[in-house]
Amino acid sequence: MERISELPDFKPTLSLTIAEAVLDAAFLYENVESEVALEALSKIVFAAQGCTARAWGRCLRAAPSAGATYPLRTYVVARAVRGLEPGVYSYQSPAPLKHALRRVEGVSVSSRGSFTILFEEVSERTTGVYGERGYMYIREEVGHAAQGALLEASALGLAGRLRKLEPPLGRIRYCVEIGARGAKLIERRPPKGFAEPSPAKLTLEEAIVHRRSVRKYSPTPLRLDELSSILLWSISGPVRPYQPLTSYRVTCYLAVRNIKGLDPGVYRYSPEEHELENIVKGDVSARLAAAALGQEWVARAPLNIVLCTPSDSPDAELEAGMVGQNIYLSATSLGLGTVAVGAFYDDDVASVLRVDERPLYIFPVGRP
């Protein structure tokens, strides 16, 4: 007989914004095993993989998925959760804002912290559609889900860390460990940079629920303060607003078409200084769209954020997903829209940007 533990429906109750969550991020603290509330577990796992709405006969989840293939199965290992028996559970979210845990009998998993979220990669769901490139999409999706969980843990005042399992546990390569906060290990002091940020219009939890992939944008230009906000909350600082796996591997470029106060062109973004360096003059959006298989939203967006890496490491792809989740939630928080674009000719994108790096993602950004 199945043992199902219903979780509280997800409701946006916290007042913190993504700007506040990344300032006091979960990964900055020592992770201490201490009893946490079931409500906290419920919110954190929802922010990773919960059903936020239904469309086209399926659930839309808190983390985006290439072609809505949803290759992840999510498990929770409970160690010290008030109101939940210790053990391994399968996470289920079959309807908007509703979710539950199903006990997995006869399985024992070593974990740290108060509870751990495991992401199993059912790769054939995505590679069956996209071939070998699907493996990159899966790692990016794990990054989105992991960062969603860590952001919610930050808002709840808990500690959390992403961990790579070596060796992997079957098809589980990455996990997120959540616990109470111990000593603060790192300080985050975001740089001032090129412009003051714009305030968020939504709380973090509201943004999690309302996040969608947006492909149609108005012709209204973006503002510098909006651009500053997205970059500050997504990738800025000597200590960035997400946890690295040993080192930072992702670089950031902007293809600007229509931002008030910023000439069209390609800009290299410096996370450490929060500054922009113009490396190509003139609007390249049409060429970038051609490199992205003719996706018109790339051509029409006032801004395209392009994430690249000089590394061959698969961990760079996971990191791109973490940055990407920040970009999605930052844009949503500002009343803007974006979509993760992973289908493009790598060499052509690099040529448009004039960089000798491997492109990982394109994020067109605009007003819905």
Which stretches of residues belong to each language-model region?
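Small-aliphatic-rich amphipathic alpha-helix that forms the alpha element of a beta-alpha
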Residues: I44, T74, F115-P167, I230, ...
